Amino acid sequence: MKFFIDTANIDEIKEANSMGMVDGVTTNPSLIAKEGRPFEDIIKDICAEVDGPISAEVISTEAKSMIEEGKKLAAIHKNIVIKIPMIPDGMIATRALSSEGIPVNVTLVFSPLQALVAAKAGAAFVSPFVGRLDDLANEGMLLIEQMVTIYNNYAFDTEVLVASVRNPLHVLEAAMMGADVATIPFGVIKKMMGHPLTDKGLAAFLADYEKSKK
């Protein structure tokens, strides 16, 4: 399973990358805005740090504008993936961009039919939002299971990119279901490495070592 980090903060990206936790990065307008720096500067810094897919999202909602914006974003770096919302105009843009060899990550996906449509349109990645679905009906992981089944049934090249990850259990369940990628906030990445027994065991080892020096 590939791990992407869901952030636009370069310090978080560098720290996670130093631990081998970053195969790619996803951003969105909200994450970019939090950094208080020019959009293109942030994206270029991320591309310089991570040699993998970097999702940058369009802000247009009309197909022609999304296509134009997507081409401009793709010109920033070879690793840019264009993030497109799951709307009818978005599927037109997805088809057009993917036909020109520009990879697309279809975002804001909440149903298996949306996921199927996005794959048919040529998306390289499709991002189901498991946390937001769980907020409504606790069905986030059911969607992942359905998507993996559908994509396997028809040998789609589209990758399931699990998004809106709220806790380590989301990552574990997605991995067990065979999802290709999880995009994970930095705080959740850190939680994935922790366990009370690890802390207890380390404390005991260190205490024994200190005793041995006396």
From Swiss-Prot:
InterPro entries: Aldolase_TIM (IPR013785), TAL/FSA (IPR001585), Transaldolase_3B (IPR022999), Transaldolase_3B/F6P_aldolase (IPR004731), Transaldolase_AS (IPR018225), TSA/FSA_arc/bac (IPR033919). Its EC number is 2.2.1.2. It comes from the Bacteria. Keywords: Cytoplasm, Pentose shunt, Schiff base, Transferase. GO terms for cellular component: cytoplasm. One of its GO terms (biological process) is carbohydrate metabolic process. The active site is at K83 (schiff-base intermediate with substrate). It is found in: Cytoplasm. Pathway: Carbohydrate degradation; pentose phosphate pathway; D-glyceraldehyde 3-phosphate and beta-D-fructose 6-phosphate from D-ribose 5-phosphate and D-xylulose 5-phosphate (non-oxidative stage): step 2/3. SUPFAM superfamilies: Aldolase. GO terms for molecular function: aldehyde-lyase activity; transaldolase activity. It catalyses: D-sedoheptulose 7-phosphate + D-glyceraldehyde 3-phosphate = D-erythrose 4-phosphate + beta-D-fructose 6-phosphate. Pfam families: TAL_FSA. PANTHER family: FRUCTOSE-6-PHOSPHATE ALDOLASE 1-RELATED (PTHR10683:SF40), TRANSALDOLASE (PTHR10683). Transaldolase is important for the balance of metabolites in the pentose-phosphate pathway. Belongs to the transaldolase family. Type 3B subfamily. This is Probable transaldolase.
